[in-house]
Regions:
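S-adenosyl-L-methionine
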Residues: 1-45
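Glycine-rich phosphate-binding "P-loop"
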Residues: 1-7, 188-196
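Short, well-ordered alpha-helical scaffold segments within catalytic/effector domains
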Residues: 10-18, 166, 199-203
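Conserved proline-anchored active-site loop of SAM-dependent methyltransferases
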Residues: 17-18, 33-47, 58-63, 111-115, ...
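Short amphipathic alpha-helix with an adjacent loop that forms part of the alpha/beta core around
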Residues: 22-25, 169-176
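A general structural motif
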Residues: 28-31, 53-55, 175-177, 212
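Class I S-adenosyl-L-methionine-dependent methyltransferase module
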Residues: 50, 54-163
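Long, positively charged, glycine-interspersed low-complexity recognition regions
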Residues: 194-262
Length: 262
């Protein structure tokens, strides 16, 4: 199945990750769940495995992705086929900063019709790596449409994780516990934009957040003051020839955690 593919998508691992998050939510009476780098919303708005929490918020710094989700949530969006010429035209307009189109349309073209889930990478052609016919854009549209009801259960907001105000988190959770799940760009991998992700700054932020909230991070590795509570070996395609490599995906938490986890 092809979801709305966002580089680093957690759809394949959702059936493992979400039960762990739900267990933490239940054991610690969390009233608020935040997916701080929600990407394709495959955790916060999964169609098969639901995050069970009273209030759910998803943050992502790509405004075109959030606009696309809002378009699906609040409007009827019919399928629009995008051929390679249209893709190149919209991509060039985007790169030129002309703002000819609405934000949701940049998201629609840039995510649903890009190869490998890289926003404005290259056009996803109508065949897979073995030459079999495949309409990637249509498949992604159908799966995005299937997420519509799940997306309605969460509030999705444009937010850079480094701009999250810890005092605002206090106001949001009030006197209750909060679980923050973070799936950051992996260290030493291609980024979504030209800005390099500041890994050191990120882990310092997680340390501060962990003083007030339950924070769970999806990563391959973490600093020594963090420990894994779950891990699974995954196989990834790394190019169009279907070459693969193997990684050990882990869920990390601060070593000296204060909350319940049996």
């Amino acid at each position: 199945m092809v979801t709305i593919v966002y580089q680093g998508s957690k759809n394949r691992l959702a059936k493992y990750i979400i039960p762990i998050l739900n267990k933490l939510i239940k054991e610690n009476n969390c009233e608020v769940f935040i997916d701080a780098c929600c990407g394709g919303a495959n955790v916060i708005a999964n169609t098969k495995y639901q995050i069970v929490c009273n209030k759910k918020y998803g943050f992502d710094n790509n405004k075109y992705l959030i606009a696309l989700f809002d378009k699906i949530k609040f409007n009827d969006l019919d399928y629009i086929h995008i051929d390679e010429n249209e893709y190149k035209k919209v991509k060039q307009d985007f790169l030129s900063g002309n703002n000819t189109y609405e934000d949701w349309y940049y998201g629609y073209v840039g995510f649903l019709f890009s190869y490998g889930g890289l926003f404005w990478g290259v056009y996803a052609r109508g065949t897979d790596a073995k030459g079999n016919p495949r309409n990637m854009g249509r498949e992604r549209y159908n799966n995005l449409l299937n997420q519509k009801e799940a997306l309605k259960t969460a509030t999705l907001t444009i937010e850079n994780i480094f701009n999250i105000n810890l005092d605002d988190l206090d106001k949001l959770k009030k006197n209750n516990n909060m679980l923050i799940y973070i799936d950051p760009p992996y260290k030493n991998t291609k980024q979504y934009n030209k800005e390099k992700f500041d890994t050191e700054k990120f882990w310092n932020l997680v340390r501060e957040m962990s003083k007030k909230c339950i924070v769970v991070v999806s990563e391959y590795e973490a600093p020594k003051d963090f420990i894994p509570i779950w891990e699974k070996e995954i196989v990834q395609n790394i190019n169009k020839r279907l070459d693969t490599n193997t990684q050990l995906e882990k869920l990390f938490v601060i070593k000296d955690y204060w909350w319940k986890y049996d």
